[in-house]
Amino acid sequence: MDYPEPIAKLINSYTKLPGIGPKTATRLAFYTLGMQEDDVVDFSKSLLSAKKDLTFCRICGNITENSVNPCAICQDKSRDQSTVFVVENSRDVMAMENTRDYYGLYHVLNGVISPSAGTGPEDINLPSLIRRLSDHQEINEVIVGTNANAEGEATAMYLARLLKPAGIKVTRLAHGLAVGSDIDYADQLTLIKAVQGRTEL
């Protein structure tokens, strides 16, 4: 038996989210149907507001409000202007900020190099990093914080080959992070140790 069209559309919408298969999407759809109408309206307003009121920082690529661009981190002159922490996504920035142990700048790639997925250096936020390093000679270290998987390693090695000839120190997070792990899932102590024990590429 097919679901009524409104439910089928809702299920289909949930399946577009990462990690949500048809069964979970169905559970979420029926849970949504059981919510109070006010809660559903608030939920939909939150989705629309996040999409409409947020953008990417024009300097680092992190998520920021439309009214705050560059983002608060890029505007903060008290931060160490000589170090840039390169991460895959904005969740990684939040994970590092929550450690309260890193006080430099960030650059969000919004992806990784992945030949199998057809994603090359030009498809991620890499050209802006090169421009940024060229425009800001005070930056003398790039910490590569891509995840410890094949794509993250490929991206790290590409960055090292690209930046080292320019005289920029390129370091990699220490492997207190398990191979295959994502930064935003690591606990704060592991992240602190990974930054402190970073090694040069």
From Swiss-Prot:
GO molecular function: DNA binding; zinc ion binding
Alphabetical list of Gene3D superfamilies matching this protein: 3.40.1360.10, 6.10.250.240, RecR Domain 1
Short name of any one Pfam family annotated for the protein: RecR_C
Disulphide bond pairs: none
Classification via PANTHER family: RECOMBINATION PROTEIN RECR
Function field: May play a role in DNA repair. It seems to be involved in an RecBC-independent recombinational process of DNA repair. It may act with RecF and RecO.
One of the GO BP terms on file: DNA recombination
InterPro entries according to UniProt: DNA_Rcmb_RecR, Rcmb_RecR, Rcmb_RecR_Znf, TOPRIM_dom, TOPRIM_RecR
Gene this chain is encoded by: recR
Protein name: Recombination protein RecR
Zn finger (C4-type) start-end: 57-74
Keywords: DNA damage, DNA recombination, DNA repair, Metal-binding, Zinc, Zinc-finger
Toprim domain sequence ranges: 82-178
Protein family (similarity comment): Belongs to the RecR family.
Xref: CDD domains: TOPRIM_recR (cd01025)
Superkingdom field: Bacteria
